[in-house]
Design a protein with these regions (language model features):
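Peripheral, non-AAA+ core regions of ATP-driven protein-machinery
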Residues: 1-218, 222-228, 330, 470-471, ...
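Walker B catalytic acidic pair
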Residues: 299, 305-307, 317
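Walker A/P-loop
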Residues: 219-259, 324
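The Walker A (P-loop) glycine that initiates the GxxxxGKT/S ATP-binding motif of P-loop NTPases
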Residues: 221, 284, 306
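P-loop NTPase nucleotide-binding/switch module
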Residues: 170-209, 213, 240-294
C-alpha cells in the first residue's frame, strides 16, 4: 500500500515541503531513499524502538520510503514522526483520513516522546502558503508555530497522541494565539535604562543620534569608563519593533531553535559574541548552514566588545554585510541568503594597556605596540562605522550624584520622531527606512549643503584625509542631527557636530 505524508525542510530561513512516500510490499527490508543524511538514515532504529514501546510494531514486510524532491538533502531527526506515521498508515495500523492535509514534524525519543524541532515558524508559514490545514509538531514548538494564523497548530508530547488523533480516539487541542493582540500587549521596554548612567552626557547624545539614524558606532575609552553599560542600553531607546520586524526576527531565531516555548520575539535583539568567535559563528554558514550572530541581531544591535581582540579575518568578513544588510553563504551545492540589518556597536581600549589619552594614568604602551593594536581594525571597516567617539572616565562628583539622568523613554520619544521624519522621506524607497541606509543617489537628493557647509566639510576632508566613504558617513549623520532638531536643511552646525564623531580619522590619534 502506498501512502503519502508531508514534512518540511528549512533552507536559510525559508521552508520547502517534503513529500514522504511510504510503500509496503511483499518481502523484507527497510529502504530509505531521497538523499537523507546520517541522522535521517538512523531514524529506523528510533522509530522501531518508539513503536515497540507504545504497543505498535514495524510491519514484517519490505518498506520503501522516498523523500521528494530527491535533489534536496534531508537533514536532522525531525523527520522521525512523519516517517513513523507514514509507516503506520501504510501498514493499516492507523486511519489515513485527511492525512494529506497535515504537515507533520518531530524527533522521536525511544519511548515515543517528542523532542522540539528547529524552524517551526518558517515551516508553518510555508504550510499556510501551500494550503495545508493542520500542522502537528512537538508541544514545545506550538506557540512558535501558532504565530501563523489560518492553520491549525496541534502541539503534542508523544507519538501516541498523534496515533489516537488519526484513529479518532482523542482530539488534540489546537494552540491558538491572536498574534496581533499578543504583540501589542507584550511590547515593553528592556530592563536597562539610560537613567542608570551617571554623567557621559555627550556620549548619550551620540547614542541618541546613532539610534535615530540607525548608524553604526564605536566607543573608544579606558577600562571602566562605561562603554559596555552604554551599549547595553542602546536597545532601550530604539523605536519599538513593528509586527513585521518581530515576525522577521522570530523567523531567524526559530531556524536555530531559540524560541521554543516563547513564541513571538517582542524586543529588539541584543547580541554580544565573545571575541574568540569564528567567522562562521559571526556571519553564519557551516556544513549545515545556520544564521550567524549578525543575522541573529537582525532588527537589533550587535555589540562587539574589545573590537581589536577579534581576529582580523573575522572582522573583515563582516564588511560586506554591513553595507548590504544581508549575508550570502555560497557553497558548491547551494547558496543561502540571511538578512542582517543590524546596528553595530563596538567598543575598544585606545591602546593595549587601555589608558592611552588618559591624563590620570601612565602610558605603558610604546607607539609601535599601539600601532600594531589599532592595525587589527582595517580602514575599510572603520569607514563603515558612522560614529567614532571617545569615552572618558566619569569623575567622582558625577558618580556620587543622587540625581538620575534622562530616562530611556524620554530619549526614545525624540528618536521615534526622527524615525517618523525618515519614514516619510523614504516612503517611495522600499529598501531604505532610515538615514544610515541611504545610497549615493539619495544622499545627493536629501543631503544638499549650503556654501558654508560645503566649505567646512571640504576643509575637514583635506585636514583629516578622509575617504569618500567617510564623506558619505558624515553627510548621513548630519542628516540625522538635522532630523532630531526637526530642521529641513542641513546646517553648518550639523556638519560640525558630525565631523567631531570621526575620532579615529583625526591626525595625531597615535600622538
Amino acid at each position: 500500500m502506498l501512502i503519502k505524508v508531508y514534512g518540511s525542510a528549512v533552507f536559510g530561513i525559508e521552508a520547502t515541503t517534503i513529500t514522504i512516500e511510504v510503500n509496503i510490499d511483499k518481502g523484507i527490508g527497510y529502504h530509505l531513499v531521497g538523499l537523507p543524511d546520517k541522522a535521517v538514515s538512523e531514524s529506523s532504529y528510533r522509530i522501531s524502538a518508539a513503536l515497540s514501546n507504545n504497543g505498535f510494531k514495524l510491519p514484517g514486510k519490505k518498506i520503501i520510503i522516498n523523500m521528494a524532491p530527491a535533489d534536496i538533502r534531508k537533514e536532522g531527526a525531525a523527520y522521525d514522526l512523519p516517517l513513523a506515521i507514514g509507516i503506520l498508515t501504510a501498514s493499516g495500523q492507523i486511519k489515513s483520513k485527511n492525512i494529506e492535509q497535515y504537515i507533520i514534524m518531530g524527533e522521536l525519543s525511544l519511548d515515543g516522546s517528542l523532542q522540539p524541532v528547529k524552524g517551526a515558524l518558517p515551516i508553518a508559514l510555508k504550510a499556510k502558503e501551500e494550503g495545508f490545514k493542520h500542522f502537528i509538531l512537538p508541544e514545545k514548538n506550538a506557540k512558535e508555530a501558532a504565530i501563523v494564523n489560518d492553520i491549525e497548530v496541534l502541539g503534542v508530547n508523544n507519538m501516541t497522541e498523534v496515533i489516537n488523533h488519526f484513529n479518532e480516539k482523542e482530539q488534540i487541542t489546537p494552540t491558538v494565539i491572536d498574534t496581533q493582540a499578543e504583540f501589542y500587549k507584550n511590547i515593553d521596554f528592556p530592563e536597562f535604562d539610560f537613567s542608570d548612567v551617571k554623567g557621559q552626557e555627550s556620549i548619550k547624545r551620540c547614542m541618541e543620534i546613532a539610534a535615530a539614524g540607525g548608524h553604526n558606532i564605536i566607543l573608544i575609552g579606558p577600562p571602566g569608563a562605561g562603554k559596555t553599560m552604554l551599549a547595553k542600553r542602546l536597545p532601550s531607546i530604539l523605536p519599538p519593533m513593528t509586527l513585521q520586524e518581530a515576525l522577521e526576527t522570530t523567523k531567524i531565531h526559530s531556524v536555530v531553535g531559540k524560541v521554543q516555548n516563547t513564541g513571538l520575539i517582542y524586543q529588539r535583539p541584543f547580541r554580544s559574541p565573545h571575541h574568540s568567535c569564528s567567522d562562521v559563528a559571526l556571519v553564519g554558514g557551516g556544513q549545515y548552514p545556520q544564521p550567524g550572530e549578525i543575522s541573529l541581531a537582525h532588527n537589533g544591535v550587535l555589540f562587539l566588545d574589545e573590537l581589536p581582540e577579534f581576529k582580523r579575518s573575522v572582522l573583515e568578513v563582516m564588511r560586506q554585510p554591513l553595507e548590504d544588510r544581508e549575508v550570502t553563504i555560497s557553497r558548491a551545492r547551494f547558496t543561502i541568503t540571511y538578512p542582517s540589518s543590524f546596528m553595530l556597536v563596538a567598543s575598544m581600549n585606545p591602546s593595549p594597556s587601555g589608558y592611552f589619552n588618559d591624563t590620570n594614568a601612565p602610558i605603558t604602551s610604546s607607539p609601535t605596540e599601539m600601532l600594531r593594536y589599532l592595525s587589527k581594525i582595517s580602514g575599510p571597516l572603520l569607514d563603515r562605522i558612522d560614529i567614532h567617539i571617545e569615552v572618558t572616565p566619569v569623575p567622582f562628583e558625577k558618580l556620587s550624584e543622587e540625581r538620575k539622568g534622562e530616562t530611556s523613554v524620554s530619549i526614545r520619544k525624540r528618536v521615534t520622531k526622527a524615525r517618523v521624519i525618515q519614514s516619510e522621506r523614504f516612503k517611495d524607497f522600499p529598501m531604505t527606512h532610515y538615514n544610515a541606509q541611504m545610497n549615493v543617489k539619495q544622499l545627493n537628493e536629501f543631503c544638499k549643503l549650503s556654501t558654508e557647509s560645503k566649505l567646512l566639510l571640504k576643509n575637514a576632508m583635506e585636514k583629516l584625509n578622509l575617504s569618500a566613504r567617510a564623506y558619505d558617513r558624515i553627510l548621513k549623520v548630519s542628516r540625522t542631527i538635522a532630523d532630531l532638531a526637526n530642521e529641513k536643511d542641513i546646517c553648518a552646525s550639523h556638519i560640525s557636530e558630525a565631523i567631531q564623531y570621526r575620532s579615529l580619522d583625526r591626525e595625531g590619534w597615535l600622538g
